[in-house]
């Protein structure tokens, strides 16, 4: 079985990576280094002590030890992987040991099949802290939409889709988008993929199911010729994979065939029939011209917003 987006892998050196793209064949997996063994680390699991590494530190760490892993993201040779952690496989075990995880798991299970639910992030590898957020994975767009609707409508004492203002402010600072706070919140609130469980934040993350994996278009991952930055206005024609990575928006535009977002900030930003305004890098490939948002980690000067909200 191939790795999927949001799986984790552990290498022979006990380095823990998050998988950031679907396995499209080849000898390596596109990942990002998250945790490394450290005798003085503040994260502890059955594997020992670890510390979490930030974006820049992850590149420095690999540059010094495995420079061959470095590309646009971190490419881990499949032969160096000793363990693959799958969100759906690990969730029942994690839920049995954690009350908050179990509560959200049981809540979601009342609306979608249990085998379509997983957990990723620090909980997946057992390195969560007491204040860690919960990152749940939902497989398949139909199930993802059902889970979002359930969370958005939840108003009980434990699980709720209503976030306090302080949490919205924290999310805005974390994302640091090229949008005003008011515009950011207007887009985020209707996505319905965020909630809290007894005061702890959780979110729902989409991953393709088996049938949707058959529709994976490798051309969306091709590196095209960069033409320059541009701002466009266009109607969204298709958005089935708007919550995927990359988020895909087919648009009605005389030159641009689709808008791709490689930053999660602009996933699920618009629906079919809406008019969007987007700024990013125009890329030309052998089969299309597209606008790419998220060409850098910070995505400065790049954004997507719906003009229909």
What are these regions (language model features)?
Residues 1-131, 139-309:
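Catalytic core of pol beta-like nucleotidyltransferases
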